[in-house]
Structures are given as structure tokens and as C-alpha cells.
Amino acid sequence: MAELVLYRRRFIPDEKILLKDDKVVSVSDDAIVTKWEVLTKRHDFTHGMSCYYIKEGFKVSKFLDDNDNIVYWYCDIIETEKDGNTYTFNDLLADVIIHN
């Protein structure tokens, strides 16, 4: 299988970002699991994992600190566009944050 290309599109601000450093952990017809480092340095978390539930239209992310402690869970409502091995995840601006 060809390597996946992942993008995140936001509408506010209007941007489409290649998730070039995300590592794909698993792929199925229903879900894509990734692990990642932050794009911009932060003091509260440094890395995490995300599961994109493609058919259901949401993403659940686990945000972790330097010691792998869970800082919070983050749920995004998304719409997924697929073109070959390229996925664009459109953030529909309805989010839920669950703090530990």
C-alpha cells in the first residue's frame, strides 16, 4: 500500500496544513490512527495520538506531556475527503475537550 498523505484543513483561520510529520500507526476502511509531535512548541503538551473515524465523521486525540501523562482528550467533528492515498480532514469547528 502506498504511504498515506494527510492534510488538516481549518476554515478559521483558512488554512490547509500537510501533516508531514504524523506517523501512521494503523489504517482500515473505518479509521486511521496516527502519532504526532506538536507543530508549534507548547508548554502544556508535546505529543499525542489521534484516531480519525472516517465514516462516523469525528476524530479523537490524546494530548500528552513530556512524561507521557494525559493532559486532555480532544474530540473534533470532521469531514474527510479522500483522493487516492491522500486524505484531507476538514475541521468543522465543533470541538469537545475533556480534561483529566
Predicted segment positions?
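Charge-rich, low-complexity N-terminal segments
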Residues: 1-48
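Generic preference for hydrophobic/aromatic residues in regular secondary structure cores
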Residues: 4-7, 60, 96-98
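A short, structural micro-pattern
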Residues: 18, 69, 88-90
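Short, surface-exposed charged micro-motifs
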Residues: 23-24, 50, 93-97
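A short, structured loop/turn motif at beta-sheet edges
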Residues: 26-29, 68-69, 98-99
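Aromatic- and glycine-enriched beta-alpha-beta binding-site module
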Residues: 45-83
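Conserved, surface-exposed functional patches that form binding/active-site neighborhoods
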Residues: 74-100
